[in-house]
Every structure is written in C-alpha cells, then in structure tokens.
C-alpha cells in the first residue's frame, strides 16, 4: 500500500493548476507519464507540459464533484472556473504506479457557462 493517499495526490494535482505551482505537478507525474484526450492521444510528459500546463494561467478555481479510488485508479470529475468567468466540467481517470501518476485519460466537453 502506498504511503501517500492517492485521493489527496489527485487533489494536489488539480490544486497545482489553481495555484500555478508547476513544481507540485512535476513531482506527482512519473517520468514515463502518458496523457490521453480526444485532442492529444498518448502524448508524453514533456509534450503534456508544453500543451496542457499553459492552461494553469486560465484556471481560477476548481471544485470536485467526484473523487473515487478503485485500485490503482482515481476517477475525478471537476468543475473549473476560468479567469474570464466561464466554467467547464471534465472527468479524468488518473492511473497510479506507486506514488506517481503514470497515465491520465481526459473526457471533456461540458461548458457550464
């Protein structure tokens, strides 16, 4: 059993986007991290930081709707508010290898406002 709570690690990962603290997310992702979404299928860690991390500047707040752990996976549904006031909802599946997130699958498309 990992020493760290995976649900808290998931919260910390999304919190990094709100705070803009890249160091936090860098520590949580494995070296062989892979990211999947309809827009980016199977990109590596470096490409993830190029494509996804800049969005941290646009995120003002994130509220969790669902956080469920099942074995090595944590399912997260969240609603985020952007700096322009628009809100959106995503669901993501985070896969862990020990105490690192090794894969993220993103399902998106819900604009709330």
Question: What is each PLM-predicted segment?
Answer:
Residues 2-5, 12, 18, 34-38, ...:
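A beta-strand edge to alpha-helix "cap/lid" segment located at domain peripheries
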Residues 20-24:
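Short helix-adjacent coil turns
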């Amino acid at each position: 059993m990992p020493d760290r709570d995976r649900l808290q690690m998931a919260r910390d990962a999304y919190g990094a986007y709100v705070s803009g603290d890249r160091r936090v997310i860098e520590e949580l992702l494995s070296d062989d991290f892979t990211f999947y979404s309809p827009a980016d299928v199977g990109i590596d860690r470096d490409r993830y930081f190029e494509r996804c991390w800049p969005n941290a500047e646009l995120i003002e707040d994130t509220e969790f709707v669902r956080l469920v752990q099942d074995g090595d996976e944590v399912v997260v549904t969240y609603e985020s508010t952007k700096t322009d006031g628009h809100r959106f909802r995503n669901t993501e599946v985070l896969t862990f290898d020990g105490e690192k997130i090794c894969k993220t699958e993103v399902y998106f498309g819900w604009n709330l406002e």
